[in-house]
């Protein structure tokens, strides 16, 4: 399901100046909590702007997310990286460094479900920006 939405995003987004980079998973096998995981994430960030998915972030509509994604593209800020934290969430220092923190609501979601939801919202945002029929209200 994740791969399907990411393929759709890549196909729809390409003509809009949005492209799919890579999906990178960081495993904190040594423990050390959120701070150690944040260091591992920082080491894998390609540079540029990153947004985090965090329950303390901004709750927004799908069109609002599309607008933010389009504005990020229009600023010419380069690649945008999306970060989903581990089981303990996002380290506060990493969250503070992010360009934006986004929440899928007040509930906490399992990591893999958050990946599906984010993948779908990326495709939906590209469809909204393209004026496509996928997003209906």
From Swiss-Prot:
Matches recorded under InterPro entries: Alpha/beta_knot_MTases, RlmH-like, tRNA_m1G_MTases_N
Binding sites annotated in the UniProt record for S-adenosyl-L-methionine: 85, 104-109
Single GO molecular function: methyltransferase activity
Main location: cytoplasm
Keywords of this entry: Cytoplasm, Methyltransferase, rRNA processing, S-adenosyl-L-methionine, Transferase
CDD domains: RlmH-like
Catalytic activity: pseudouridine(1915) in 23S rRNA + S-adenosyl-L-methionine = N(3)-methylpseudouridine(1915) in 23S rRNA + S-adenosyl-L-homocysteine + H(+)
Presence of keyword Cytoplasm: yes
Top-rank taxon: Bacteria
Gene Ontology CC terms: cytoplasm
Any single GO BP term: methylation
Subcellular location: Cytoplasm
The EC number(s) this enzyme carries: 2.1.1.177
NCBIfam families named among the record's database cross-references: PRK00103.2-2
Protein role: Specifically methylates the pseudouridine at position 1915 (m3Psi1915) in 23S rRNA.
Family, per entry: Belongs to the RNA methyltransferase RlmH family.
Protein name: Ribosomal RNA large subunit methyltransferase H
